[in-house]
């Protein structure tokens, strides 16, 4: 395996064969490819546009090298995670939605880290509300089983990423590493709501997840660039369910919700993001609550806790109105600090 030769082929717009991509990723993740060459390779792949096979191979390697979390019954296990890198600087929509989905009976294996390209990452806001991020795999497995939700702080589970992390940080642009995070859930969640930073990635990642054995997933991209289901206009969806992929688009009006500008959801600090998350869990009406209804409804649906997305949205509404979603957040704060004491 010759990284220079692979780079030359990438620059000529050639796809890297699956087995060769596996070998290349193992070399990168073991520190056997220099930072300069790693940066050139991932930038070249980005310009060429990563193929289904290349992404699948890279994700397979990251999954192999990840610290695993074993959950006894994973049938309703779901992750709500985005690629980030959308530049929209919204509050943590998928993180807030995770509490709502957990309140509805989904088992949420939330996977995330600190912000790389946005204002506030999921780990930043969860830490701000009092959740202890430093938990062992066994403790997180218990959290998922007993509380219904657990948070996996990505750096604690993807130790091999330490070789690529400085490159990713210094480049400061979207690369295959943005795509890989949501594809490498340490608990192996086979149900997923996955937001992506580019519309072209919806169908691509649906095919990747199909190859990787996912059960029910929705890959979403808002027309405003948001890596979530958006309120400002249409959202492009690629839905993988029972081995088949269907592509379509939805609008807020399809669920009886009003459109709202992206600016109404943007934050400038962790404090702003925390305040908006808590406002939604307190069931305060407005665009923040509405966008969580849309996204949590989808998560509830893919987790198998509603037989349609529309019913998932109504269940999400009930979870916020009853206070069950806020109670789920409080339960996770309490559990994470008990087990870490």
Curated annotation (Swiss-Prot):
InterPro entries assigned: Anthranilate_Pribosyl_Tfrase (IPR005940), Glycosyl_Trfase_fam3 (IPR000312), Glycosyl_Trfase_fam3_N_dom (IPR017459), Glycosyl_Trfase_fam3_N_dom_sf (IPR036320), Nuc_phospho_transferase (IPR035902)
GO terms for MF: anthranilate phosphoribosyltransferase activity; magnesium ion binding
EC number: 2.4.2.18
Binding site for Mg(2+) 1: 94, 228
Substrates-to-products reaction catalysed: N-(5-phospho-beta-D-ribosyl)anthranilate + diphosphate = 5-phospho-alpha-D-ribose 1-diphosphate + anthranilate
Residues holding Mg(2+) 2: 227-228
Gene Ontology biological process terms, A to Z: L-tryptophan biosynthetic process
The record's free-text note on cofactor binding: Binds 2 magnesium ions per monomer.
Subunit note: Homodimer.
Protein family per UniProt: Belongs to the anthranilate phosphoribosyltransferase family.
Biological role stated in the UniProt entry: Catalyzes the transfer of the phosphoribosyl group of 5-phosphorylribose-1-pyrophosphate (PRPP) to anthranilate to yield N-(5'-phosphoribosyl)-anthranilate (PRA).
Name listed for the protein in its UniProt record: Anthranilate phosphoribosyltransferase
Species per Swiss-Prot/TrEMBL record: Nitrosomonas europaea (strain ATCC 19718 / CIP 103999 / KCTC 2705 / NBRC 14298)
